[in-house]
Amino acid sequence: MFELMDKAPADPIMGITELYNKDTSPTKINLSMGVFKDEQGNTPLLDCVKEAEAKIYATEDTKAYSAIEGFSSFNDAVLPLIFGADHEAVTSGRSATIHTPGGSGALRIVGDFLTKLSPSNTIWVSDPTWVNHINIFETAGLQVKRYPYFDKMTNGLAFGTMMSALKDIPAGDTVLFHGCCHNPTGVDPSNDQWQQISDLIHGNGLMPVLDFAYQGFAEGIREDGEGPLKLVQPGKEALICGSFSKNFALYNERTGSLTAVAADAAAVNIATSQIKSVIRAIYSSPPAHGGIIVSTILNNPELRTQWESELKQMRERIQNMRQLLAETLTAKGVPGDHSFITRQRGMFSFSGLNPTQVEQLKNDHSIYIVGNGRINVAAITPDNCDALCEAIANVS
């Protein structure tokens, strides 16, 4: 049977890293994968994670299954991390968090949950969006449609065009938003724009899903939620997918969360029961170790403070590399105003490079970026920025 199948195409992001790994050039640069790197080009293990793991090793006495929803110590710590402990959605008891295998796992659960229970099988995603959004939701059985988001002329948010498109979405459909640090553009709505988005979404009877994969990477934990959490209005529903790959640097632990917000506590209990039913049919219970690390850190004041300090260092390094990238592109004579790079937020910059230029960078300079021109700014270092910008100048 297998020999009769067609070979699946390489993943548009993971496949680039496979090519990079085969490249023998000593000066090769990989800016495709969404991972943070330090100034030496390494993806670090946070000190707070090391200390948490030491505590876990000293006290852990079982590897028994967790519950379908994961450990309560994780879920009870993550819920106020997302909202803040005094947020109405927390204090009212109308929200609940479930531990998932990464943010991708949370998104897939959302897809299956909506396919099973939503009156509409359509979800709307931004154009552009993270490429795996489409793969995840279509595989779950949803119809994926796009709403305009990015203005290529200004390298900013196409807010008016987006709002016009959102107004035309039929009631009952689901709309996915990026919580902060939009992937791939790095362009986020302002807090006032988030309020307008929220009023439109709930006024028109749409279901918001928030992909909150980069909390803490734009301005800070609380600051990054101030705008997007306006989607969580009293008495209204929402689904929030979280990831701890980036802000805890737990990439290979696959640690994420899914938070359901309902009209009241009784309704959220119904929703979580259905989510658990979906989970049981996929993986039964989440991998424990990453969640135990996160809960150990969040529930220990000293480790929590240390984590926030290390998160700040990562955030500031990315901001510094944005500034360096913009300045070096200008110094190398690359046409255009590059100040937009410093206004974008998070790990990614939508560079404006076209597919031909991306191929030239790979073939002529051993520089690997995603085909749509997305650059992982968090993988730029003071040592490779000059060579990167020189290569971009050569293909511009």
Where are these regions (language model features)?
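Hydrophobic beta-strand scaffold residues
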Residues: 31, 144, 208, 238, ...
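Active-site PLP attachment segment
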Residues: 227-270, 274
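Short Gly/Ser/Thr- and Asp/Glu-enriched loop/turn motifs at secondary-structure junctions
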Residues: 93-94, 341-346, 370-373
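Conserved PLP-binding catalytic core of the aspartate aminotransferase-like
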Residues: 308-364
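N-terminal "arm"/small-domain region of PLP-dependent enzymes with the aminotransferase-like
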Residues: 1-70, 77-80, 281, 287, ...
